[in-house]
Amino acid sequence: MSIIYDDAPLEDRIHRALSDTFKHRAIETAQDVITGKRDALVAEVDNWEDFRTHAAAIRDHVLENLDYYVRQFATNAQKNGAQVYFAPTDNDALDCILDIFEAEGAKSCVKSKSMMTEEIGLNTFLESHGIKPVETDCAEHIIQTAGNAPSHIVVPALHFDRTSIRNLYHEQKGYEGTNDPEEITRFLRKTLRPEFMNAPIGVTGCNFGVAETGSCTLVSNEGNARMASSIPETQIVVMGTERIVPDLRSLDVMMKLLVRSAVGAKISGSFSINTGCRREGEADGPKNVHIVIVNNGRTDILAHEFRPMLRCIRCGACMNSCPVYRHITGHGYGSIYPGPMGVVLTPLLVGYEKTAKLPYACSLCGQCAEVCPVKVPLPNLISQHRRNVVSQGYVSPVEKAIFTAAAATFSNRVTYGALTAAAAPAMKLMTGKTNQLDRGSTWIPVLNGWLASRNLDTMSSKKFRSWFAEHKKQEEEQKRAETAQALTDACRNNANREEN
């Protein structure tokens, strides 16, 4: 699977998503539950905003000195016995990983959840070379078994319910149990345990690489990441160039923010700091550790106005609060990175040729920026994408002509006045006594998309400027009358005092 997994037009993806009632219920429930938990935990932290500001400063500091911290991380990782590789592109990363498999003579591996391996399309690549990757994260295993795409970066199987999971495992894995989650989990544990014990290689991601120690960290709620990184003789870590923190103190700040923002919990079920290979006398851990640091366009992002996007710590808080994600679901975006962060990141990684309309899957309400733990200005970056799409010529000639005409109309007072004067009676003629354009008016060009799902009130026959002028005149007359009355009352009071 590559970054874009659905090449259908955005409109088609949205229509498909809107027709799936289960996905809507699942997304709404997940958003409400996770956001509720997150808000409750955030309220317990008196200096939450200070944490956000500090975390954003840490991320900016790393990005400003990325060469230094990547070198420091690589040097210390090598001192710990790991082999470090730098992959400029996704293809370079895939070739590097394949070389490791071939050197080990491995034909299978166990994997923990990793957005970077999804970004470079590792599973599909390995399968094309006769290598069997086994996802061990529960949700990722469901996705892999179904041959489906993830709908969330933290909860990828959000679009499955317990019955569909039970039926999937019955058809694909011979499961004969009920749809009880605990029973399904026990079956999955029994299925995966031999894979862990027999796999020659474990492939993991890396939430944060710690520069001062050369350590790779893994956050998990199931413990599968710890097993994938400790049981196989060889571990391959795949991480993005920007996934670095300077030291353990900075890591502590990030972890406080990450787990609260991602799932509304104080701590994760499992958190590992892996530092190098198994040492003499240690009972477990990999004998060989390979760390593949993937650039894949990140230094290009670092060089322009989208640089703040590289602060992102992949918590998913932005999509948990996004009204557009709530309606079109993760699959409406057609990318492994959905939601507001995906609207920004996907065009940066694959270009506007395939994603020119994606920046418009946003209401610009700003809620994503309010909840982002590292203060990524997502609405501003999405607006910049829109400007780029227009300036670089990725809009259709018809759309360009429409907006050019609109600009000419709205910038000319005479033309604008004449148009609005004609529009009000025309709309009343079309609506009759209802004073609303509704679904019966979808034949009207330009407005048909709006009217298909909501009504539009007719324009008032009185212009706002006229109403405002009259209202202002009335206010001035009232003030003059009040002033005159006040003077009259004052004179009367003075006269009364003189008489007395």
Residue ranges and their predicted role:
Residues 312:
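Phosphate-binding glycine-rich loops and their immediate beta-loop-alpha structural context
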Residues 315-319, 365:
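Extended amphipathic alpha-helical segments enriched in small hydrophobics
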Residues 130-135, 250-256, 289-292, 367-374, ...:
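Short secondary-structure transition/capping segments
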Residues 6-34, 44, 402, 408-500:
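Intrinsic disorder at enzyme termini
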Residues 281-309, 324-441, 500:
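Ferredoxin-type iron-sulfur electron-transfer modules in oxidoreductases and energy-metabolism complexes
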